[in-house]
Amino acid sequence: MPVTSELILAALLLVGVLAKSHLIAAAACILLFIKLARFDLAFNFLEQKGLELGLLILLLTIMVPLANGKISERDIIYNLTSIPGLLAILGGALATHLNSQGLQMMQADPAIIFGLIIGSIFGILFLGGMPVGPLMAAGIAALFMEFFKYTK
C-alpha cells in the first residue's frame, strides 16, 4: 500500500491529538478536509499567502498590548535602554535571521517540514514546549546544518 498524502495527514492528525497539540491536529484536519474536498485552490492560496497571513495574525496578537495602552511610553524607553530590553532587541534580530535561514531551507527542501513537525511533537511531549513556528525550528535546524558543515 503506497503512502499517500491523505495517509500522512491522517497520521499527523492522530499524532497531534495523542500529543495534545491542538494546532498540529487542527492544521492536519483542515488540510485533510481540503484534500478530500479536492479544493486545490486553497492549497495554492496557502502556499502563496499562508505564511504571511499567519505571521500577520501572530503580530496582531503580540501588538495588542501596544494598541490597548497596556504598554506605556516609560515601558518603551526602558526596553530601548535597559539590558533586558537591549537583549530582547538582539534576540529579535537573531530570531528573524534564523527564521529567514529556516524559510530558505524549507523552500529548498519542503520534505524537511515532516521532521520539523515530529521535532515539535517531541518538544511538546518531552520538553513542555509550544509549537509556535516551524520557521524558527527550521532556522535552528539550518544553524545546526551549518555547524556540521564546518566541523567536517
From Swiss-Prot:
PANTHER family: UPF0756 MEMBRANE PROTEIN YEAL (PTHR38452:SF1). InterPro entries: UPF0756_TM. This is UPF0756 membrane protein Daud_1310. It comes from Desulforudis audaxviator (strain MP104C). One of its GO terms (cellular component) is plasma membrane. Keywords: Cell membrane, Membrane, Transmembrane, Transmembrane helix. HAMAP family: UPF0756. Belongs to the UPF0756 family.
